[in-house]
């Protein structure tokens, strides 16, 4: 047997296109915490428009719901201009008739952020780049490139998105008894200031794989540890590793990086030749 689920698209209408103020994917487990973040606090990827943009690997804004004011992508001017969203997806209402296709994107428009500015949907979502003062100002101002920072949502709490996500992730994980991933959308009201609607679209458990490690590493005795690091990314199990090349840190100097790289390359080639 197979079930077919029809899910209503969430959003606001802007002429011949339809899209939410923002869409996102949130996870209750963060495998790559940054700075003060903790793995159990989760992580969020947020974008303007339909969520297909996130699924397709578009440039989203990544933040921790426990630290919404600390966003790496907007921490520096150069990073914010290079690593923030410039495109978004909207539903094409002119192509919403009987012209169906197996392509799930047949009735979607991939638009530049400038089109959202024309729609008036960037209020509370975008900031404005001032090329004269070389700063990004929270909010919309005449002239200047519009940068999708969600600053008024995350830093100024115009809409309590971070609090809602913390609550949903906590109770979702509690009820499923395992880490969860959620999909959500938000529509902001343009006729009433600082109001909107949060839509919880999907809740699903994070699927385990053989590359994920579900073990308390702090319980492993020191005498059984080969290598230990307090500054590493993620964790897991890889059964295909047979040799480890270790660069001693006692007398390590960055000035010798090129020579060290050559030495490591020779060792790697030796392993490859030996099969």
Locations of the language-model features?
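Conserved mixed alpha/beta core segments that line enzyme active sites in large multi-domain catalysts
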Residues: 1-275
